[in-house]
Amino acid sequence: MTNDVNWQNLRNQFPTLDKINYLNTCSLGLLSNQSKNALLTYIDTWTTLGASAWYSDWLEKTNSLKVEFAKLINASADEIAIMPSVSQAIAVISSCIDLGTDDEVVTSELDFPTIAHNFKARELKGQGKVKIVKSESMEYVDTDKFISQISEKTKLVATSRVYFLSGYINDYEKILKVARINKALFFLDDYQATGQLPINVKDKDIDIMVSGGLKWLLGGSGIVYMYVKKELINQLEPSVTGWFSHKRQFEFDPHTIEFSDTAARFETGTPSISAVYPAEQGLKFINDTGVENIRHRTLHLTSLLINSLI
């Protein structure tokens, strides 16, 4: 419950809220004092240490970021990859999946279009087919209609927990069960949910999940988190890759590629350290407050708003 949370103190950490009531976190989360100070710390470290900051501070800061996100979703840090965007994440995962002419990927028209775009591009090259389930209302996709499109031909099912257009909470667990029956990978876009709705990736047996700092995780742009279930990591070999996927990237060996045994194998280039600093503070804010508390508070405020309009 929320009795032990001082919401006014938390609110005071966001200077923007001194001026306005903000209702657009679904587009961009506000900057907290902690995240602003973290950005200044990054600048000071860069100014003071130059390139040596990579080894004294920055690489460890990236690892700390993985630990914080893993804590939030009940995963291990080794199951987390740091990516620059969901588009990059889906491109890497797509490159791990061999698609024959008759193989299928199932998504919906309410899921963020970067998912369909990636596989549409492959479809144009004769690599699989994309089935995009339509919505009658543009608010939600009928779950039974969605699962009717999943078959033994399906290689990947990709959908959202919260639809970005409407905020509707999708019954993804029902979809996941049917994907599992048909031995298809399940990819959950959780960008509009993580931080405001609790999730336990182990309890739900999710294969792959992406989220990011831009919205409800209060970290700003340039950071996406990708969870890949431990049992899947070594089964997936990306062809969209980069030097940070290598087990020993600092050997700078162009002759061999030996992927990391962790989810780092799905990373590509150098992470944006300027984005890592505020993103870590955003995650700490969410973890310290507690997602269950945030959810209860959101429902309470929503109820007050609805009742005031009746």
Identify the function of each model-found stretch.
Residues M1-I310:
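Pyridoxal 5′-phosphate
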